[in-house]
A protein has these predicted regions:
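Short, gly/Ser/Thr-rich active-site loops of penicillin-recognizing serine hydrolases
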Residues: 183-196
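Solvent-exposed coil/turn segments that connect beta secondary-structure elements
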Residues: 12, 98, 158, 169-173
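A short acidic/glycine-rich loop-to-helix N-cap element
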Residues: 172-181
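Short, well-ordered beta-strand elements
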Residues: 6, 17-21, 153, 162-172
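Short, Gly/Ser/Thr-enriched beta-strand-loop segments that form substrate-interacting elements
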Residues: 112-115, 124-159, 169
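Active-site lining segments that contact anionic ligands and/or coordinate catalytic metals
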Residues: 44, 51, 90, 134-136, ...
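A small/polar active-site loop signature that marks catalytic segments
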Residues: 1-88
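A conserved catalytic-loop motif detector
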Residues: 66-133
């Protein structure tokens, strides 16, 4: 469990690859990427997640070959909220303005609205059904980047307590500007953009 936190918070690609190989080794007695990818596909199928575009090359995402759609990754986020391991998973994601790869992002935005003792009744009511890690205003976001690629995926808890699953991939020569777009989109969600 602590390994997953290290992988996600710090975007540790070497450790992510080792998890795939370990999964393969434990389930098949042969630690290789092919078996690890098959185990993941079997798990997805068991959870009614058909992802024909999915390509797993090394398990870390640090690849020009690996593929998954934003919509399918968002479905995994929705599945994650209902998982018995949800707290471990959600707490493993970097928290905007607090830690990991999101430590220096959205800091001013979040300072402006961090809940205090006057937290609204709406916020409390909307969050009753969610795990403790999704009961505080903010963003739990895994980031990813390659040359010409920027991505985010995770959960945003808005000012009113609405929880949004969000995934965005930018594949473009100007993807470096994607950080600005992603932060703007996350800010919009923090402000309950879809509800306005």
């Amino acid at each position: 469990r602590s390994s997953i936190k290290d992988i996600n918070k710090l975007s540790n690609n070497v450790m992510a690859r080792q998890v795939l190989l370990t999964l393969s080794l434990e389930k098949t007695a042969i630690g290789n990427t092919k078996n690890g990818a098959r185990i993941i596909r079997d798990w997805l199928q068991k959870n009614n997640l058909d992802m024909p575009e999915l390509i797993i090359e090394n398990g870390s995402g640090l690849s020009r070959i690996e593929r998954v759609s934003a919509g399918h990754l968002n479905k995994i986020l929705l599945l994650g909220v209902n998982s018995p391991y949800r707290n471990y998973f959600i707490e493993s994601l970097p928290i905007a303005g607090v830690d990991g790869t999101m430590k220096h992002r959205l800091v001013d935005k979040l300072r402006k609205y961090f809940p205090n003792k006057k937290q609204s009744e709406d916020l409390k009511k909307n969050l009753e059904l969610f795990p403790p890690s999704l009961k505080n205003y903010g963003a739990h976001i895994k980031t990813g980047s390659l040359v010409d690629v920027r991505s985010i995926s995770g959960y945003v808890i808005s000012r009113s307590g609405q929880v949004y699953a969000v995934t965005s991939f930018i594949n473009h020569p100007n993807a470096g500007l994607g950080k600005i777009f992603h932060d703007t989109m996350l800010s919009w969600l923090l402000d309950d953009g879809p509800m306005n």
